[in-house]
């Protein structure tokens, strides 16, 4: 079953929605990439036996924060918290990623850009970027998008054709077993 990762990657990369969305110059793909690499590097750090520095996952988290803002830190923190809550040796695993050192690295890499832009653009940048793009978008309806939460299941199913057919096939096969 070593081919499953390749098939899954190709199914994602060749989905119409991903192809169309990647051509619109929206930073979501870059956010997904940097968050994904950060999480992969954290996972590798959890399970390697060497106890060297843990810098690279934090650098990629910093790049994700530079890409889309604090939402990247929230996504990574929630993912790590959920993962660690399922592990018996969560304290040892948490210490392997050196969270205090990592938060400092993340802060040192991502903060200077935000400070420079804030000094140049002033309060309007803060209000627009943090207030609108990072708070309102995730807590309220913006741009008159009032579709219910399940609407996006439909969009993802259509946007992932023809590969979404295999998802439903897999779900039905699992239920039958």
Task: Report residues per predicted region.
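Membrane-integral, polyisoprenol-dependent glycosyltransferases
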Residues: 1-177
């Amino acid at each position: 079953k070593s081919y499953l990762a390749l098939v899954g990657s190709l199914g994602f990369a060749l989905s119409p929605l991903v192809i169309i969305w990647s051509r619109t110059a929206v930073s979501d793909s870059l956010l997904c990439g940097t968050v994904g690499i950060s999480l992969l590097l954290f996972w590798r750090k959890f399970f390697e036996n060497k106890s060297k520095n843990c810098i690279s996952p934090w650098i990629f988290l910093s790049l994700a924060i530079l890409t889309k803002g604090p939402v990247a830190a929230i996504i990574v923190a929630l993912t790590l918290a959920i993962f660690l809550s399922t592990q018996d040796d969560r304290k040892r695993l948490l210490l392997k990623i050196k969270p205090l050192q990592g938060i400092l690295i993340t802060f040192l890499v991502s903060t200077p850009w935000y400070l420079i832009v804030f000094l140049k653009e002033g309060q309007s940048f803060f209000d627009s970027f943090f207030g609108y793009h990072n708070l309102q978008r995730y807590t309220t309806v913006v741009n008159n998008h009032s579709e219910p939460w399940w609407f996006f299941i439909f969009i993802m199913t259509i946007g992932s054709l023809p590969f979404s057919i295999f998802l439903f096939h897999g779900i039905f096969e699992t239920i039958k077993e």
